[in-house]
Amino acid sequence: MVADKGRRRFLEGVGAAALASGLPSHTFAAGPQEKSGVAPRKNSALKPFGFVIHGGAGTIERSRMTPEREKAYRDKLTEALHAGYEVLNRGGVCLDAVVAAITLLEDSPLYNAGKGAVFTNAGTNELDSSIMDGRTLKAGAVAGLKRVKNPILLARLVMEQSPHVMMTGEGAEVFAQQKGVELVDPKYFYTEERWQQLQKAKEAEKNPPPKRSKLERPESEAPPLKGATLLDEHKFGTVGAVCLDKSGNLGAGTSTGGTTNKRFGRVGDSPIIGAGTYANNETCAVSCTGDGEYFIRTVVAHDISAQMQYGGRSLSQAAESTLEKVAKIGGTGGLICIDRHGNFAMPFNTSGMYRGWIGPDAEAHVLIYRD
């Protein structure tokens, strides 16, 4: 049900920590914002719902973006937001909205998931994905896929139609075939842009540029972010979604092609429940993007939930605190999260993150840069 605009609000600038990240926290809630993410739900006929997505965090700067390309990114994010909204507005379940949006992003060559997946060192594409139901705490994840068109669909089947949580490689694709999931020729994932990114990454490995001191760097050039590397520009693109449906259930999903030039079957945080994806109706739903190794080591997605459940922190406080832990050990990235009351946050410590949200008013909001 569409909430009355006079009673619905979007709070911005809640908490110094949120402001420090350059990204305010917001809420879809119709009533007063909760001070803690674990406070009892208030009875409300308005039944707020909300949907938040991301298309990856990384070195995303206006100076490198053409107007045409920026429009393409914004249009696809808007389309994905409306896909999730249509499910939630008619009273659909949270995970249907998550899958609807992520499938659209997986089918787009713009994002590092599905069709737009980056290449491994061997010149192949290896896809990872995960999904979690906050109501039941059931979860499904897949990794190392080479022929599954939409990994998020298979992750959900692992959750709902198998006794397992995670499947990988050939075994996962056998399961996909048995369940009727669409398989494609590996050539489907090829895009010239991603191929050229691989070539540049390999060349950078062979001929790394010399490090410059602060004195050698022009004043007009900003210093690199902590934890940044030469290949940061190839890391963004992971996609994810989190939502709160009208029944008060939370859900989260994430999908990625990993990192350009990865080797040896490397798997990042995206398919790791508790690191890249997590959902619990008692606290929040989270989807992450960034340096996967660091997000795994700090168990980002679950840590946010734990800080809320055991430490009494609000969603934005927990999200900021956890991302600070990532930065402290050298990691970069971002995340989206939403709690049981409709409060949500989208912090990141990179120069940009593709992100957006939509609520009962059906108005899609899309942001890319830090400012």
Regions found by a protein language model. Name each.
Residues 13-15, 19, 31-371:
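Alpha/propeptide regions of enzymes that mature by internal proteolysis
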